[in-house]
Amino acid sequence: MKNRIVNKVCAAALAGLMAMTMIPATSVFADGNTMTIGVTSFADTLEPTEQYFSWVISRYGVGQGLTKFDEEGNMVPCLATEWTNSDDGKTWTFTIREGVKFSNGNDMTPELVKASLERTMEMSNRVPEFFDIESIDVDGQDITFHLNRANANMAGCLADPLFLIMDTSIDNSNIAMEGPVCTGPYAFQSFDPSGDTVVVRNEYYWDGEVPNDSVTLRIIGDQTTRSMALQSGEIDVAYNLKTENVFEFDGNDNYNIQSLESLRSTYAFMNQNGALGDIALRQAVLRGLDKETYTSILLEGGATPGKAPVPPTLDYGYDELNDENAYDPDGAKQVLEDAGYKDVDGDGYVEDPEGNPVELTFVYYDSRAELGVYAQAAQASLKEIG
């Protein structure tokens, strides 16, 4: 089984990555109460219903939803203070927090919450992945969702940044460049999809003091370049550094290292057409990947081996799951043999049951250096099983 690794294009690598952030030890940044953060990327547009761009709108302090996850992965209130659901799981009622204003000073009313969610449901083709809405009602401070199908995790669904609450009572015709007006600690001042994006303090923020007057989000795609920018003082915070770059700062009292087990998983998707249309080959590939070694040695503990779509940081019984395709190179070879894969030409690699060479292409994007490391390790592992 021969493998080719092609740089740049599609999908990815592991699971449960550790988010690494570096900041100077002093809380005083250059130019008064401002801060510059080096980020991997931002967004092509600030329209929150486009692709997954609502993630960056929320991640950098602008967007908020009715619920959210805390640092321990627990579901907690945000713009809703509490919620209840019917026994059949088809009716969910959320109490909207009083006294919240959008960053333009407009009151966040239950009616505007409903309008914001209805806008998202109308404009995003991702909504059916979360729930199937029949209707939404408003009664005082309560907003009630009537579902066509039961959903036991409606509160969790609404924590997704896709469902951030924005002011729909204003002119949003230029939202792609100006961004949505939301309730988070910051509001957009300027946006450059390939350069700097600036957010400024929301004077109407409802949940405590906002630490900076403004924050500049500077796109520095390469992790090593981002590390160098932090050392030179070009940026004040470096987000998502490689483990080897983090070691450059370890023990240096001038910097703080903050790390948090991520709620995100990084996947490698298999195309179930062509050669990988054969489930036996897919099973053999999975059993041939030594994810434990990849994460502990190659990524130096910066990730956790995955075995499910959700990471271990979410309490969905991850530790109790049985990985039927755990690393087992001998088992992988046996699966191939049982399915009729044989090394017909004696080159050390099997051909498929019809005698055709098996060539697989691993496609990944290059803004995260660890993906290339993983792809090359996967190539080496699959060579070992033929």
Question: Model segments located where?
Answer:
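Gly/Pro-rich hinge or "lid" segments in bacterial periplasmic/extracellular proteins
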Residues: 70-74, 159-210, 214, 224, ...
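Append "and occasionally in soluble cytosolic enzymes with long acidic Gly/Pro-rich linkers
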Residues: 278-380
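N-terminal lobe/hinge region of extracytoplasmic solute-binding protein
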Residues: 38-87, 118, 181-182
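Ligand-site clamp/hinge motif
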Residues: 202-248, 379-380, 386
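Sec-dependent signal peptide cleavage junction
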Residues: 22-32
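Short, well-ordered beta-strand elements
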Residues: 32-42, 91-94, 113-116, 143-145, ...
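Aromatic- and charge-enriched surface segment that lines or borders ligand/interaction sites
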Residues: 81-123
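Surface-exposed binding/hinge segments that line
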Residues: 84, 88, 95, 128-169, ...
